């Protein structure tokens, strides 16, 4: 059984690309036709590429790999957060801070600051500080949480990125490529597929399309984790083999 059906893709509007004047010729192989000035994506190819992305993600997660979900455009923000949280992975859904990957040590210092302020809030320090200082700390905490909340538990560089709209997230793409971190991406007709390791040709502007495809990547991670749990349970319940001596 395939990971995703043509019906699901059609209903979510995955096949609608960009206007023909806003296209990248490298996406030609994923285009089925043109209709009313808009490119229509070949969903047969999308089905196959979703399957490829699903298996890649599942295998990576099965080996303990960590995946960073990235989508800062309005249509992607909610799905990216929800599906990353659901699958126990990390996310960036606001602004990508330059150096998130390539200057990871500096980002870790900002995350430490975020956690320090959280501790101050939890252990009662806020109650003994001047009101003005507390207001400033709360503002700082809110800002740090907004931009770093989705990666505050990410202790090492991720093993892969899942990106919605590589054109919009070009800084994230450039950083990942510099560090040889593989990228899975939802790639519309105006993007460059050569920058992405596992291309999912799809509409990256429709909320339903983004939600559907992002949820499939989360499903792949959860399937891998479930497989691990079942294997561990089987090991625990397996009867010990007795050895007999002649």
Swiss-Prot record:
GO terms for biological process: translation. Pfam families: Ribosomal_S2 (PF00318). Residues 229-239 have a biased composition (Acidic residues). One of its GO terms (molecular function) is structural constituent of ribosome. It comes from the Bacteria. SUPFAM superfamilies: Ribosomal protein S2 (SSF52313). Residues 224-246 are annotated as: Disordered. Keywords: Ribonucleoprotein, Ribosomal protein. Gene3D superfamilies: Glucose-6-phosphate isomerase like protein, domain 1, Helix hairpin bin. InterPro entries: Ribosomal_uS2, Ribosomal_uS2_bac/mit/plastid, Ribosomal_uS2_CS, Ribosomal_uS2_flav_dom_sf. One of its GO terms (cellular component) is cytosolic small ribosomal subunit. Belongs to the universal ribosomal protein uS2 family. NCBIfam families: rpsB_bact. This is Small ribosomal subunit protein uS2. It comes from Bacillus velezensis (strain DSM 23117 / BGSC 10A6 / LMG 26770 / FZB42) (Bacillus amyloliquefaciens subsp. plantarum).
């Amino acid at each position: 059984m395939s990971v995703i059906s043509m019906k699901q893709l059609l209903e979510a509007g995955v096949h609608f690309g960009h206007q023909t004047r806003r296209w990248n010729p490298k996406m030609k192989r994923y285009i089925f036709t043109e209709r009313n000035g808009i490119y229509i994506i070949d969903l047969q190819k999308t089905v196959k590429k979703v399957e490829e992305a699903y298996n890649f993600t599942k295998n990576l997660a099965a080996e303990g790999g960590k995946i960073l979900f990235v989508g800062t455009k309005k249509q992607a923000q909610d799905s990216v957060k929800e599906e990353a949280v659901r699958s126990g992975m990390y996310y960036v859904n606001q602004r990508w801070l330059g150096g998130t990957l390539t200057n990871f040590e500096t980002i870790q210092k900002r995350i430490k600051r975020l956690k320090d302020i959280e501790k101050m809030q939890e252990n009662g320090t806020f109650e003994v500080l001047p009101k003005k200082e507390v207001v400033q700390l709360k503002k700082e905490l809110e800002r740090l949480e907004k931009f770093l909340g989705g990666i505050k538990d990410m202790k090492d560089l991720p093993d892969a990125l899942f990106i919605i709209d590589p054109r919009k997230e070009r800084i994230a793409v450039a950083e990942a490529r510099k560090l040889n971190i593989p990228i899975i991406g939802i790639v519309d007709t105006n993007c460059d597929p050569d920058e992405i390791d596992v291309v999912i040709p799809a509409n990256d502007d429709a909320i339903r399309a983004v939600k559907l495809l992002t949820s499939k990547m989360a499903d792949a991670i959860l399937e891998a984790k479930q497989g691990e749990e079942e294997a561990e349970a089987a090991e625990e319940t397996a009867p010990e083999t007795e050895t007999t001596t002649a």
